[in-house]
């Protein structure tokens, strides 16, 4: 282990790395069930769903193992959120345009992912992606971590537990707080929300308990604070389901199959590239889609690597991460593997930050998570019972910690402050790391040009900004 991962050199141990790997896996285990749901339009139990489920586990493991041994970094990969939703939308449009079934359209769009992965492999081998990283201004790089932190908190508070999501005029605590006249009392909200009210209350309370447990343990120097906090939150949530909701949180385990559906994967997704339908969608559309996938994936990955590495102290004084080329190459291999297995773009997950916060510093963290993905081919029903409240407590805590990176931003320099501020707004709102970086890059370039300092901006920075402008306003 020492010879492969250099544990002592990185100030860590086997125990710490394994706990960090488990922590990262638990915070992103939701992707195992959610990815096939999104890519198949929730066609649960169908051959395509089973194939995508296995593809998710296998492709995530392959990409993460490559990251572990090639880059020796504690980053974990899986099919990217946002990218998978975009994939599903495109597949649906292709099915309608070509008047074909969804599975055939799905296999046509897989060709786009394959081409994207091959392009990334070439860009990584020839150091072009590394040069793109260096073309991102220092101020923007310093703000990526805090912006990701806000996005993690937004996921934890909004998407996972819905603490401020509004629906039907009645909802969660944050919206009740704005009711200055007291009309929206708990009893009124309960009457309108029905059974969902108790579910919401249990989820929110459990999330905060998990968060406070993590904070208290972290203050005491417990390295497994995030993992323990998630376990405590899970137990409390399960107990609450039994006691207060009268439901069985483990009901999904009854009659569940623990055997991987390899036959369905071979029949529907494994190397199932439908190039005939791919060429039928038109060259302009195909190229536009490939460029869109490439840009989103590239800057999502770069942002995650830079932001998480900065939080872990893995960057130099200029904000650059050693072995960036190897990390980007691992990401490209993951995307190609994902396309071959039958899933959307595989990318580095922002949830890797939770493992880093738990002490993960080497590829052993990644290797641990990779083994868990492979194990989930057999224990997927078990992974699915991890409540959103437990995941949210970890995401919010890590997001808070990542905000500390703002102290490195020079607030006296508007060239840094304005792009960082816009990125802090854009990233959680859009839910895309790449879009946040794009807005920051465009604003940085515009400020430099109109302040008479255009020569301070590199040619590659201009090119990237122009590509983002095209992406936002020209490519549909």
Per-region residue spans from a language model:
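Alpha-helical membrane-protein architecture signal
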Residues: 11, 15, 209, 287-291, ...
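Hydrophobic/aromatic residues within the transmembrane alpha-helices of Major Facilitator Superfamily
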Residues: 22-29, 62-65, 69, 153, ...
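Transmembrane helix-loop junctions in multipass membrane proteins, especially transporters and channels
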Residues: 36, 40, 68, 72-76, ...
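Helix-coil boundary and interhelical linker segments in multi-pass alpha-helical membrane proteins
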Residues: 37-51, 91-108, 280-286, 387, ...
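Membrane-embedded alpha-helical modules
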Residues: 95, 102-232, 367-476
């Amino acid at each position: 282990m020492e010879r492969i991962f250099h544990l002592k050199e990185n100030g860590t141990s086997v125990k710490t790395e394994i706990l960090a790997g488990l922590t990262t896996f638990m915070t992103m285990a939701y992707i195992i069930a959610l990815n096939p749901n999104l890519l198949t339009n929730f066609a649960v139990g169908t051959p395509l769903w089973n194939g995508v489920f296995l593809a998710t586990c296998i492709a995530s493991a392959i990409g993460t193992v490559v990251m572990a041994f090639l880059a020796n970094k504690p980053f974990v990969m899986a099919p990217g959120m946002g990218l998978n939703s975009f994939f599903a939308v495109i597949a649906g449009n292709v099915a309608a345009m070509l008047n074909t079934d969804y599975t055939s359209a799905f296999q046509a769009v897989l060709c786009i992912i394959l081409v994207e992965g091959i392009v990334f492999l070439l860009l990584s081998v020839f150091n072009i992606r590394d040069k793109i990283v260096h073309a991102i201004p220092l101020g923007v790089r310093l703000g990526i971590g805090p912006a990701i932190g806000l996005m993690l908190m937004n996921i934890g508070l909004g998407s996972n537990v819905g603490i401020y999501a509004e629906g039907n005029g009645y909802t969660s605590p944050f919206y009740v707080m704005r009711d200055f006249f007291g009309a929206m009392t708990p009893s009124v909200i309960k009457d309108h929300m029905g059974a969902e009210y108790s579910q919401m209350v249990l989820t929110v309370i459990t999330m905060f308990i998990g968060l406070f447990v993590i904070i208290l343990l972290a203050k005491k120097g417990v390295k497994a604070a995030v993992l323990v906090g998630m376990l405590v939150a899970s137990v409390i949530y399960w107990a609450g389901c039994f006691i207060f909701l009268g439901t069985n949180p483990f009901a999904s385990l009854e009659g569940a199959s623990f055997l991987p559906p390899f036959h369905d994967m071979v029949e529907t997704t494994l190397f199932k590239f439908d190039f005939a339908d791919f060429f039928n969608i038109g060259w302009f559309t195909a190229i536009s889609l490939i460029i869109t996938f490439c840009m989103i994936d590239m800057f999502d990955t770069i942002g995650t690597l830079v932001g998480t590495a900065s939080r872990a102290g893995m960057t130099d004084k200029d904000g650059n991460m050693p072995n960036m080329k190897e990390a980007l190459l691992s990401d490209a291999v993951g995307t190609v593997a994902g396309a071959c297995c039958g899933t959307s773009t595989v990318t580095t997950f922002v949830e890797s930050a939770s493992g880093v916060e738990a002490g993960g510093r080497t590829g052993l963290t990644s290797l641990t998570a990779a083994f868990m993905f492979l194990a989930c081919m057999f224990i997927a029903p078990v992974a699915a019972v991890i409540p959103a409240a437990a995941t949210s407590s970890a995401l919010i805590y890590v997001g808070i910690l990542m905000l500390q990176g703002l102290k490195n931003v020079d607030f006296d320099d508007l060239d840094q402050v304005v792009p960082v501020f816009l990125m802090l707004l854009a990233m959680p709102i859009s839910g895309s790391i790449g879009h946040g970086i794009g807005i920051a890059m465009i604003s940085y370039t515009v400020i430099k040009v109109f302040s008479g300092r255009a020569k301070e901006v590199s040619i590659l920075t201009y090119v990237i900004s122009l590509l983002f402008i095209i992406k936002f306003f020209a490519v549909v």
